[in-house]
Amino acid sequence: MNYNNTLAPICLFVYARLNETRITVESLQKNSLSADSQLFIFSDGSKNVNDRKRVEAVREYIHQIKGFANIEIYESDVNKGLADSLISGITKIITEYRKVIVLEDDLVLSTNFLDYMNEALTFYEDKKRIFSISGFSFSLKYPKDYKYDVALSLRASSWGWGTWLDRWEPIDWELKSYSSFKWDLLKHIRFNLGGSDLSRMLHRQVKGKIDSWAIRFTYYQYVNNYLDVFPTKSKVINNGFTSESTHTKYKSDRFDTTLDISEQRTFSFLEDIKKEKYITKQFYKHYSFIGRLKDKFSKTSWKINK
């Protein structure tokens, strides 16, 4: 094997969506760093008899994938669900390689996605307040003299992201600190600076109404006062709002973004690790109750249970 050990390994989580999986992989293959990168594919087992053939079709496809330095496939005999599949899969790979890039089977990636992710993971590795690197971003307004290719937020994105072992390993997946959070209004207000939907999703997770790795990931980020890095030009768009989606069924205009189609391969990163009020305000507005209410009554409303 002649793969490049300085590049972060890529974990791809798939289930039963052949077309979406193919689109994700093909966009990843168009990245110049793909040939030097390791790809680890985790295929979850079918939930029921109806899904079995679709799972098998995806598995037949992933065994034909080429274009990477090394490909390893892990097929589960049982249905773990996305949360357990992702947590266990990432833990397996990140424990060995100490950093990871994570994809699900519903994304379209820019051709410079791997350049951006690897450069950001290297640049911010020793800046311990940075919790994760996001590849997705929605359209934000920046000062005219803004010269960086990234910004910082209180909320991570689950659509193409990366992190490091020392941030991942201590995460409280069991939400042991929730009891001290539940009735503390000030903590709710602070958590919801990343979006007024966060506390509600966390409560639903604790009650067992959703099974989400992402809300637990974001809650741990809040508890530790971490920040997320995201690009000023999105390196990812989501292609997963279909009837076959496990967690997202309806597309939302709030998540429309423009994919970076430039040939840029080196990026300018922020040295000063602090949150900016104008970014926080835009995130809060984007994920606000009013914004979600507009979606609910629009033709493009969506439902998330991730």
What are these regions (language model features)?
Residues 1-102, 107-306:
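An acidic/histidine-cluster motif and surrounding catalytic segment
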